[in-house]
């Protein structure tokens, strides 16, 4: 398991009951799936696609009145089609909600970071 993330604003300094990770399945050195892991039992719900290598998951919390925990975003390299896409998953079920193919292939990267346009300081929110 690599790149573990939690809902930082809701769990900072407190116990949490789930985390999201990228993990390798089989002999691959690169992550081949994204997983929602419940703590402490280690039960995992996953998303994967043949020939696809997801990057670091980014958790986006849903509004308080939503029926889901939020969304999980990841930039994915599809080695079979030589394309890169952004996948949006339901963070509760790990079902794919949306996908946006980028106009050009991005090399596989280790971390994905997002910055507010008016604040270059990294935000965990």
Model-derived regions: residue spans:
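Beta-propeller domains
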Residues: 1-125
């Amino acid at each position: 398991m690599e790149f573990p993330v939690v809902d930082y604003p809701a769990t900072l300094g407190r116990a949490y009951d789930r985390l999201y990770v990228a993990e390798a399945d089989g002999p691959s050195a690169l992550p081949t799936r994204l997983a929602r892991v419940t703590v402490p039992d280690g039960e995992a719900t996953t998303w994967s696609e043949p020939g696809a290598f997801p990057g670091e998951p980014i958790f986006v919390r849903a509004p308080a009145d939503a029926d889901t925990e939020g969304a999980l975003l990841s930039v994915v390299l599809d080695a079979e089609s030589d394309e890169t896409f952004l996948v949006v998953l339901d963070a509760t079920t790990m079902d794919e909600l949306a996908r946006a193919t980028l106009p050009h292939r991005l090399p596989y990267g280790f971390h994905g970071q997002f910055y507010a346009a008016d604040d270059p300081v990294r935000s965990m929110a």
